[in-house]
């Protein structure tokens, strides 16, 4: 019979252990190469973040960041609340406008007499005007409160020569109110050119003046009263003479409202 030939033992491959495990021997750790240093650090220093010398500083910075974050949150909440209030106010105003359809009162000049203007002297004048203003509130469900701190001025050639105020009163819906005003000026110095121009206008019986009214008002919608608004009335009035009684030759008024 032929003899069996067994393969020879192959040397151990790279990465395989060649130690005798049966005898309990394990391969030793390789020694570090020359010029290599191994530093061992205690575990309590490795996991300590931040290090002890910076711990207090770290706590201060963390506290500041928390405070800043809280301030930002409060400020953002405040802005959001203000924005919501503005939106709600705008919606309420729009609803009231659609329900009531408000219109500004109509104004006209019913009487306008002048006294105290002497064109034959160069001395300062102290003019006086008796003015009758008619206000018509045509709104069906809206009242108007005329507040304090109003102003009424009479101008000639852009020179303020007399002034006064509107009375404080309440004008209900669908109402016509006639207001009598007494306006006066003191020591108004007219130039020679203004006196000459006035004399020429008196001869033609067309002396022009401008009346300006600024009246703070509040509007009443049912039981709701609005904030203060400003009614501005501008009237061009022409009279025939500078003594009472004078006759109105022409008149024209316009108005607008400052909501804020």
Curated annotation (Swiss-Prot):
Keyword Transmembrane: yes
Glycosylation sites: 120, 130, 175
Biological-process GO terms, alphabetical: defense response to bacterium
Membrane topology: Single-pass membrane protein
Induction remarks: Induced by infection with avirulent Pseudomonas syringae pv. tomato DC3000 (Pst DC3000) carrying the avirulence gene avrRpt2. Down-regulated by Pst DC3000 virulence factors AvrE and HopM1.
Chief subcellular location: membrane
UniProt-annotated stretches for the region Disordered: 1-35
Originating species: Arabidopsis thaliana (Mouse-ear cress)
Gene: NHL13
InterPro entries tied to this protein: LEA_2, NDR1-like
Protein name (record): NDR1/HIN1-like protein 13
Localization in the cell: Cell membrane
Keyword field contains Cell membrane: yes
Highest taxon of source: Eukaryota
